Design a protein with these regions (language model features):
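Conserved beta-hairpin
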Residues: 4, 14-22, 27-78, 82-85, ...
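Conserved GNAT acetyl-CoA-binding A-motif
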Residues: 104-122, 313-325
Length: 374
C-alpha cells in the first residue's frame, strides 16, 4: 500500500445543516460532537435519492418514483422505530425503504439496529431475503446496520453476479479465476462530514494519462511512489496494469472532481502473497492523493473507509483486506490503525521495508468502520 506522505490540509468543516431540528436527536448528536444531519443522499438501486430529515420525519425523493415517500423515525438509542408516516398509504418503492434506512443509520451512527415496519409485504420479503431485516422475538422486524452496509446495490450501480469459482495457476500460484475488470462508475457514497459524494470510476488511459502524469511528478507523491517520468513511461505503466488480470486502476472523485488514483488487487497473485497465508479472495490496494487540496484528515477518512467498503462489496467471499505501507510512513499507518487495520508483521519487499496490516470483514461491518473514529 503506497500513499503520498505529506498531509497539508486541516480537517474540513463538516456539512452544516440549513434547518434547525427541534427533536431530541439533535441534542443527542450535538452532545456527541456531531452536526445534526438534516439532509442526506442515498444511491439505492444506483440512483440518487434525496432524504430530508426534520426531527422524527423523513422524506425520500428520487429514483423511478414520481412522488415522495414519508417516514417517521421515533424512539432513541437502541429503540428506534422506522415506519411509513401514513398507514394505508400507497406502499413506497423498495429503493425508498433502503434510502430511508440508509439515512436513519447515518443520522444515528451509534445505533446497530432498529425496528422497521415496511408497508409493502413484497418489500419486506426482499429485505428479509437479503438479510437486511431479521425477525425479532417480539414479532417485530429489525433492520441491521452491518447487513445493510453489505448490500452492493446501495453503493455500486449495476452490480454483476458473483464470479463462479474456477481455479487457475499463475507463476506457480493456484488461485480463483478473476472476474473481468470493471468499467465506468464503480462506487458512489455520500460523505456526511464533507457534505459531498465520493465516487470510484475505472481509469481510462487516454482521458486520465495527463492527470496521472502530473500527479506522479508531484514531489510529495514521488517520495513514496518513486515513479516520476514522462507521458510515455506512465502510459506503459498503466497499460501494464490494464493487462494484469489481478489488478485494476481507479480514479477517486468528490462531487465529480478527480483527486486520487487507486490500484485494487487480489493478494493471492501479488508480491505480498509469499509473506503471509494468503486466502483466495483477499484484497489489497495502493493510493496516491494527487491534488494537494484534498490531503488532510477529513478527506483521508473519506477515501480510506470507502476503499475498504468498495473492496468488501465487490465479492462477499472477501473476508480480509491487506495493506503494505512503508514502515516509515507513520501518518499512513496511524490512519490505517484508526480505520480498523491491525498490524500483522514487518517484512521486506525489494523496494521497501513494509508493515503488513489487515482489516477483517466482520470488524468493518459490525463496528461501523465507515464512520470516523477518534
Amino acid at each position: 500500500m503506497r500513499t503520498n506522505r505529506r498531509q497539508t490540509v486541516k480537517f474540513a468543516t463538516p456539512h452544516t445543516p440549513t434547518s434547525s431540528p427541534s427533536s431530541a436527536a439533535a441534542d443527542t448528536q450535538a452532545a456527541a460532537g456531531r452536526p445534526f444531519l438534516s439532509s442526506f443522499l442515498s444511491y439505492a438501486g444506483g440512483q440518487a435519492h434525496a432524504v430530508r430529515i426534520d426531527g422524527a420525519s423523513l422524506q425520500v425523493e428520487g429514483g423511478p418514483a414520481e412522488t415522495a415517500s414519508h417516514w417517521t423515525l421515533s424512539g432513541h438509542g437502541g429503540d428506534l422505530v422506522l415506519r411509513p408516516a401514513t398507514e394505508g398509504a400507497r406502499p413506497a418503492p423498495a429503493a425508498h425503504g433502503l434510502a430511508a434506512l440508509d439515512a436513519a443509520f447515518a443520522a444515528h451512527p451509534e445505533c446497530r439496529d432498529l425496528a422497521m415496519h415496511p408497508a409493502d409485504p413484497q418489500a419486506l420479503a426482499a429485505l428479509a431475503e437479503a438479510g437486511v431485516v431479521l425477525p425479532a422475538a417480539d414479532g417485530i422486524w429489525r433492520a441491521c446496520r452491518d447487513t445493510l452496509w453489505q448490500q452492493p446495490g446501495l453503493w455500486r450501480p449495476g452490480v454483476p453476479p458473483p464470479m463462479a469459482q474456477r481455479f487457475a495457476l499463475t507463476e506457480g500460484r493456484y488461485h480463483p479465476r478473476r472476474a473481468p475488470k470493471p468499467h465506468g462508475l464503480l462506487y458512489q457514497r455520500y460523505i456526511p462530514w464533507l457534505g459531498r459524494t465520493f465516487t470510484f470510476r475505472s481509469l481510462e488511459i487516454d482521458e486520465d494519462l495527463p492527470r496521472f502524469n502530473r500527479w506522479m511528478n508531484d514531489p510529495d507523491v514521488a517520495v513514496i511512489w518513486e515513479e516520476e517520468g514522462d507521458l510515455q513511461k506512465h502510459r506503459a505503466y498503466l497499460e501494464g496494469i490494464a493487462r494484469d488480470p489481478h489488478m485494476h486502476s481507479m480514479i477517486a472523485s468528490l462531487d465529480g472532481e478527480p483527486f486520487a488514483y487507486f490500484e485494487a488487487y487480489w493478494t493471492k497473485e501479488s508480491r505480498i502473497a509469499p509473506f503471509y497465508d494468503a486466502h483466495d479472495y483477499d484484497r489489497g490496494w495502493h493510493v496516491l492523493v494527487g491534488e494537494p487540496a484534498f490531503r488532510g484528515k477529513a478527506f483521508a477518512t473519506a477515501w480510506l473507509t470507502s476503499i475498504s467498503h468498495y473492496l468488501f462489496l465487490c465479492d462477499a467471499r472477501t473476508q480480509r483486506i491487506l495493506g503494505e505501507p512503508r514502515i516509515d510512513h507513520h501518518q499512513q499507518i496511524r490512519n490505517l490503525d484508526k480505520s480498523g487495520y491491525a498490524k500483522v508483521k514487518e517484512f521486506d519487499l525489494p523496494h521497501k521495508r513494509a508493515q503488513l496490516v489487515m482489516l477483517l470483514r466482520e470488524h468493518y461491518f459490525y463496528d461501523g468502520l465507515w464512520m470516523p473514529r477518534t
